[in-house]
Amino acid sequence: MFTDIDTQMNTSHALGSATTIRSKSLNLDKAIAQAQAQLHALQHPDGYWLFELEADCTIPAEYIMMMHYIGEIDPILQSKIAVYLRAKQSADGSYPLFHGGAGDLSCSVKVYYALKLAGDDIHAPHMSRLRHYILSQGGAAKANVFTRIALAIFEQLPWRGVPYIPVEIMLFPKWFPFHLDKVSYWSRTVMVPLFILCTLEAKAKNPQQISILELFVLHPDKEKHYFPERTLLNKFFLILDKIGRVTRPLIPKKMHQLAIKKAEQWIVERLNGEDGLGGIFPAMVNAYEALLLLGYDKNHSYVKTAKQAIDKLLVVKDHEAYCQPCLSPVWDTGLTALALQEVDKIGNREVLTRAYRWLKSKQLTNEPGDWQLTRPELAGGGWAFQFANPHYPDVDDTAVVAFAMAESNLPDLTDSIQLASQWIVGMQSKNGGYGAFDVDNTYYYLNEIPFADHGALLDPPTVDVSARCAMLMAKMAKQHPDYLPALHRTIDYIRSEQEDNGSW
């Protein structure tokens, strides 16, 4: 039996707990209100949101290397990027691919070269630590393909140290084991200008003739193991690589010129104005350098526009600067709108109306796109990640934006939601899942080619993208029961991909 004192203590404890809960609730409400007000203030007058998209240090380093490739160096900008790069170094001297991650050899090599190009003394403590890390990982010869191509262009290693990727690949028929349509969109946009740069063996101007031979364990001319044999299939592709190099002189000149012209036309068709080839930095910078190598004057509209697209990615602050991998207004706007309407659909109506009006204007309904190669009869309806990237709408952005629209209960969005939902259902892969940009991009044997050591050649279905598509289809299935078969296939795919510990 409780005594009066026990009762008083229990009552006091309960009141204290309730007070704590109310206090936390008030703090949470205050935080939500402050975040909401800040998001209101950050909305562009046109209706979108755009936040900085910071990645690893590879791209800022590549921006410095690009300046030295063309021989046009902005010393103030270079100095600010160097400040940014130094600040991101890990304690062991390396540079990771994500905050707090393990060091990455390829990223570290590019940062070292960029800092040396920017004038850093190789005996400075940060450079010594970085060099020690690189050498401990086998040196620059063990960096990935993209890094070795950059080093070959800067004449730091021989061209035999990079895969044989002739521009004649542009002429391969679709049934051929390797074809552009069989790799991801980002691989396509990066590779086509690389075909030109590698086939013509581009040479950086490198006005100060900066070398990084100190990053090689063995002199690059003596190195014989640029391509470690990973599997039996990989060994077979390495043999084909050697055969291709030997037979290269046998390629007819007309065929060679035709292939270069086709690659050039492919790039020009997709230059995408000031939003750039593919809307991503690696493709943009390769296209910019390829156009110059093909003889385009630096004042040609294609070249000037390509450079402007690259420079739009810069984030320049008072004391530092970096280059983003791409811009993300559609993604940022979709997620922000979804968050705001979860807080208050009525109070945020004006803000949301502006956001969805802008998003409607960015929906891709009739534009030609690479996705149509596998779905020629499917009507458009997707969104791209960037301000403009009409050849490459993506399933992920489309699912998020359409879901947010459907949740908003705002008028005049029905047609956009319907087009997007139909497009999503039509972009389903055979296994029920969804890739980011393409259908059934599952030519896994291509991961064994020498060029694919970076592990991002393909665009196969993934659980996270598929889950967002399932959210949209589930939302729409009440009005469109014809979506249910696709939804069930997606759920089956997601379940099949669950990890042993229960996670995805």
Regions found by a protein language model. Give the residues of each.
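Preference for long, amphipathic alpha-helical scaffolds in soluble/luminal domains
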Residues: 1-504
